[in-house]
């Protein structure tokens, strides 16, 4: 049975995560406030960031940058800016 939460990203009720996907206090916040749908949107943006900026998850500075982008995207309403990328609907 899935959990329903109020997703702060989508601003509506949605299916919550099945388990905590990220460590620490931030992970608890994501588990309690971010839906599966919003997390999937973040994963798409995260993949683009890693690829376009050539980030390495072995590099602590790159992981910190990615975490900052994640917080801004999920909780502060700031879209991820990827230089040179234009979404298909805006071309």
Swiss-Prot record:
<dbReference type="Pfam" id="PF04362">
    <property type="entry name" value="Iron_traffic"/>
</dbReference>
<dbReference type="InterPro" id="IPR036766">
    <property type="entry name" value="Fe_traffick_prot_YggX_sf"/>
</dbReference>
<dbReference type="GO" id="GO:0005506">
    <property type="term" value="F:iron ion binding"/>
</dbReference>
<protein>
    <recommendedName>
        <fullName>Probable Fe(2+)-trafficking protein</fullName>
    </recommendedName>
</protein>
<dbReference type="InterPro" id="IPR007457">
    <property type="entry name" value="Fe_traffick_prot_YggX"/>
</dbReference>
<dbReference type="GO" id="GO:0034599">
    <property type="term" value="P:cellular response to oxidative stress"/>
</dbReference>
<comment type="function">
    <text>Could be a mediator in iron transactions between iron acquisition and iron-requiring processes, such as synthesis and/or repair of Fe-S clusters in biosynthetic enzymes.</text>
</comment>
<dbReference type="GO" id="GO:0005829">
    <property type="term" value="C:cytosol"/>
</dbReference>
<comment type="similarity">
    <text>Belongs to the Fe(2+)-trafficking protein family.</text>
</comment>
<keyword id="KW-0408">Iron</keyword>
<comment type="subunit">
    <text>Monomer.</text>
</comment>
């Amino acid at each position: 049975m899935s959990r329903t939460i109020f997703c702060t990203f989508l601003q509506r009720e949605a299916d919550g995560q099945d388990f905590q996907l990220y460590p620490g206090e931030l992970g608890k916040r994501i588990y309690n406030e971010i839906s599966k749908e919003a997390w999937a949107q973040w994963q798409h943006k995260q993949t683009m960031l890693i690829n376009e900026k050539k980030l390495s998850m072995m590099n602590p500075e790159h992981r910190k940058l990615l975490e900052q982008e994640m917080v801004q995207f999920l909780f502060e309403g700031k879209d991820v800016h990827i230089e040179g990328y234009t979404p298909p609907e805006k071309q």
